[in-house]
């Protein structure tokens, strides 16, 4: 997540354009030219303000940086043997990742802003992969709570 935030900061314009097109809903027309063949029944959802689009992108980057920092702390906790703390911190960080990719990109971007209808500016497949990876990691982290002999972890 920290690398993702770093990439979005150092190559700000590329992904800002992505966010702008998704929020503006100007390519939700199944591959037609931008602005053509748009569904008038849903275009009221579009956010056309460049200020709001950029603010949204900055919030995404901030969320990525924060979730990355939480996960980095959890890695340090795992490495220093603070198992219970690491599990709790990992859970928070992974839930933040799931909230961003599933809640933010698939639900809000994909469904509310109809990102799935765009042939050029859709990120639903990538968001799905990231959501599933974070979910499986979360499950793996939580399964470690019960030791093989059935005893509960005592941890620090």
Can you annotate each of these PLM segments?
Residues 1-7, 54-60, 66-156:
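Extended, low-polarity transmembrane helix blocks
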Residues 1-22:
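N-terminal signal-anchor transmembrane alpha helix
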Residues 8, 12, 41-44, 54:
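Generic structural signal for short, flexible, solvent-exposed coil/loop and linker residues
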Residues 20-51:
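Extracytosolic (periplasmic/ER-lumenal) interhelical loops and adjacent juxtamembrane/interface segments
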């Amino acid at each position: 997540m920290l690398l993702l935030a770093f990439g979005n900061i150092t190559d700000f314009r590329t992904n800002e354009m992505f966010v702008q097109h998704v929020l503006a809903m100007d390519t939700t027309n199944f591959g037609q030219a931008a602005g053509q063949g748009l569904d008038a029944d849903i275009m009221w959802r579009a956010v056309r303000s460049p200020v709001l689009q950029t603010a949204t992108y900055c919030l995404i980057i901030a969320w990525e940086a924060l979730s990355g920092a939480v996960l980095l702390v959890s890695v340090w906790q795992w490495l220093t043997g603070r198992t219970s703390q690491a599990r709790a911190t990992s859970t928070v960080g992974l839930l933040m990742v799931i909230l961003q990719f599933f809640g933010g990109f698939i639900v809000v971007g994909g469904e509310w802003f109809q990102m799935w209808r765009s042939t050029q500016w859709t990120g639903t497949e990538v968001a799905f992969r990231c959501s599933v990876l974070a979910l499986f990691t979360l499950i793996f982290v939580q399964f470690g709570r019960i030791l093989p002999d059935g005893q509960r972890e005592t941890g620090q």
